[in-house]
């Protein structure tokens, strides 16, 4: 695993990233707009797919090894009274993820994605 020790190292690494392929983005947008659906009806997913097409330099990029990452924490939000569940529920929800009983598990299973 790559270890980065400073923001300068991250910046240097980012400078070496390939530039977006605008022709691929345009082709992906044209394809999106030709689909039988209202323009923009898939929300942010449409924007993400255009970014992915430009990044991969192809109109129809594929994801060969899908993976979902799940992060959980309380970070004091329960003390603010904005969460509908008590703090103890976080641990139980994560345990349910680990046991394969949550909606995210089913979505990952349907997509063939690994859940971490």
Curated annotation (Swiss-Prot):
Pathway: Nucleoside biosynthesis; alpha-ribazole biosynthesis; alpha-ribazole from 5,6-dimethylbenzimidazole: step 1/2. Keywords: Cobalamin biosynthesis, Glycosyltransferase, Transferase. It holds the Pfam family DBI_PRT. GO terms for molecular function: nicotinate-nucleotide-dimethylbenzimidazole phosphoribosyltransferase activity. It catalyses: 5,6-dimethylbenzimidazole + nicotinate beta-D-ribonucleotide = alpha-ribazole 5'-phosphate + nicotinate + H(+). GO terms for biological process: cobalamin biosynthetic process. Its EC number is 2.4.2.21. SUPFAM superfamilies: Nicotinate mononucleotide:5,6-dimethylbenzimidazole phosphoribosyltransferase (CobT) (SSF52733). Belongs to the CobT family. Catalyzes the synthesis of alpha-ribazole-5'-phosphate from nicotinate mononucleotide (NAMN) and 5,6-dimethylbenzimidazole (DMB). This is Nicotinate-nucleotide--dimethylbenzimidazole phosphoribosyltransferase. It comes from Rhodobacter capsulatus (Rhodopseudomonas capsulata). The gene is cobT.
């Amino acid at each position: 695993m790559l270890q980065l020790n400073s923001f300068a190292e991250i910046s240097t690494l980012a400078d070496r990233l390939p530039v977006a392929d605008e022709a691929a983005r345009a082709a992906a947008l044209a394809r999106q707009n030709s689909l039988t659906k209202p323009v923009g009806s898939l929300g942010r997913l449409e924007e993400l797919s255009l970014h992915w097409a430009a990044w991969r330099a192809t109109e129809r990029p594929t994801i060969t090894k899908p993976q979902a990452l799940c992060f959980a924490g309380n970070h004091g939000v329960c003390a603010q009274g904005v969460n509908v569940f008590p703090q103890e529920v976080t641990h139980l929800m994560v345990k349910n993820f680990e046991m394969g009983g949550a909606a995210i598990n089913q979505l990952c299973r349907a997509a063939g994605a690994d859940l971490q």
